A protein has these predicted regions:
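A short beta-loop-alpha structural element at the N-terminal edge
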Residues: 5-19
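Conserved GNAT-fold acetyl-CoA-binding loop/helix
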Residues: 22-50
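Conserved beta-strand in the GNAT
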Residues: 61-63, 69-78, 85, 90
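A short, internal acetyl-CoA/4′-phosphopantetheine-binding micro-motif in the GNAT/acyltransferase core
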Residues: 89-96, 122-124
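Conserved catalytic-core motifs of GNAT/GCN5-like acyltransferases
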Residues: 121-125, 130, 134-156
Length: 164
């Protein structure tokens, strides 16, 4: 098993992170009519990009490393003093299904031990993600946003609550 570490990313690492993100999301593009993931308007997509995340005070961009090789990334946003949302989470396809994602999410919990509630969202078409978050990572589906024809998707909203 590789050693998983997290490092806060710098803006000059953006291009490398975007390449990994693109490959990671391409794996699921077959579930969407236009092959675009996430299936939102251009404005919403722009607001959720890695580049935009570097500009937000309440968000931190991370690189995920397996044995010192960058294999993924995430954007963690502070919601309240004890609640955070993982706005983006992605791994290189070569690392998916090998325990790296589960261990990376555990590393985020260790990085922010004061966080009592973790949230994340994934499209309803990507059931593999939902199964992973629920069965492997201990998240619970707390809401299902209905299918939106304009966005071509519904969304699962997950939470994981910790006792501190």
């Amino acid at each position: 098993m590789p050693v998983i570490t997290l490092k806060r990313s710098k803006k000059d690492e953006l291009t490398h992170l975007e390449h990994i993100e693109e490959a990671a999301f391409a794996v699921n593009s077959r579930y969407f009519e236009n092959g675009v993931l996430p299936p939102f308007s251009e404005e919403e997509r722009t607001a959720c990009t890695l580049a935009a995340s570097f500009e937000r005070d309440v968000a931190a961009v991370f690189s995920i490393y397996a044995d010192n090789e960058r294999v993924g990334g995430a954007v963690v946003q502070l919601l309240t003093h004890d609640e955070r949302e993982i706005v983006l989470f992605f791994l290189a396809p070569s690392c998916q299904g090998k325990g790296v994602g589960q261990r990376a999410l555990n590393a985020f919990e260790a990085e922010f031990p004061e966080t009592k509630v973790w949230r994340l969202i994934t499209p309803t078409q990507v059931l593999r993600n939902a199964v992973f978050y629920v069965n492997k990572c201990g998240y619970h589906i707390v809401q299902i946003d209905a299918y939106d024809k304009e966005k071509e998707s519904g969304m699962f909203i997950f939470e994981k609550r910790k006792e501190i």
